[in-house]
């Protein structure tokens, strides 16, 4: 199995603060894994994502993503690198006054400031692909609805559709279901699981620990600046997971 992310003895702190946020983190993430990142608030889960996308430099250690040393990237290399990564957050990055279809077109367009120029050169195949992705995500009937008319779960599906159209290789999801009810959260995780089975790698910062066992391949817990737990979910029961989490947090 190919390594997508390799962190070796990474330590991080913000600005000139003396306290480390993460300390000597060593971690490998493999292609096609759906990984839950868990831990108390403020322990460095979001910081880990910033390290992976090279928006925050560690004070020591080595980082490889897609088998590239991202700490040595120039501007062009970083741009190409970021284009392979998709992001999901609590609040989808959408234009709420526009419809679903147009939001997806805008997200893939190099003519973002000239939307109608891009729309006019879309091929029939590209248009069909957009509708196919919306159909896969059960929101085809919402294609020409304004985003503001959709539920929170449907809005997240639109955001996911954007990532599918862009064909990203790695998805970093920072609590994408925290504003959703339990059933909708499960539906979103099922979608992410299906995407990971297509050899896409997905890391999810998640707060609802009851969802970890059934919907993730692997769980990594961070606390006190360290990785304190890293297991395949198939190798541990929900009872064992709950017990270990309670003892570490």
Where do the language-model regions lie?
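The feature captures the beta-strand-to-loop junction immediately N-terminal to the Walker
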Residues: 38-40
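Helix-to-loop junction immediately C-terminal to a conserved catalytic motif
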Residues: 53
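Conserved ABC transporter NBD signature motif
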Residues: 61-69, 81
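Conserved ABC ATPase "signature" region
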Residues: 117-141
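Conserved ABC ATPase signature
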Residues: 146-150, 154
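Catalytic Walker B motif of ABC-type/P-loop ATPase nucleotide-binding domains
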Residues: 171-174
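H-loop/switch region of ABC-family ATPase nucleotide-binding domains
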Residues: 206-207
């Amino acid at each position: 199995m190919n390594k997508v992310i390799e962190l070796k003895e990474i330590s991080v702190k913000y600005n000139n603060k003396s306290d480390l946020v993460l300390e000597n983190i060593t971690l490998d993430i493999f292609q096609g894994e759906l990984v839950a990142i868990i831990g108390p608030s403020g322990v460095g889960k979001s910081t880990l994502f910033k390290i992976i996308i090279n928006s925050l430099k560690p004070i020591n250690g080595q980082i490889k993503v897609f088998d590239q040393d991202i700490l040595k990237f120039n501007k062009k290399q970083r741009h190409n690198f970021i284009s392979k990564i998709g992001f999901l957050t609590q609040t989808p990055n959408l234009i709420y006054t526009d419809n679903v279809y147009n939001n997806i077109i805008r997200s893939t367009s190099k003519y973002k400031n000239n939307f109608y120029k891009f729309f006019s050169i879309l091929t029939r195949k590209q248009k069909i692909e957009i509708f196919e992705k919306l159909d896969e995500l059960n929101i085809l009937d919402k294609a020409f609805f304004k985003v503001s008319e959709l539920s929170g779960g449907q809005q997240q599906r639109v955001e996911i559709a954007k990532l599918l159209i862009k064909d990203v290789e790695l998805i970093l999801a920072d609590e994408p279901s925290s504003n959703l009810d339990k059933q909708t959260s499960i539906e979103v995780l099922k979608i992410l699981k299906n995407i990971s089975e297509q050899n896409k790698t997905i890391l999810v910062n998640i707060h609802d620990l009851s969802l970890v066992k059934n919907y993730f391949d692997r769980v990594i817990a961070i606390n006190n600046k360290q990785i304190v737990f890293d297991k395949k979910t198939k190798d541990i029961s929900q009872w064992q997971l709950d017990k270990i989490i309670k003892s570490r947090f």
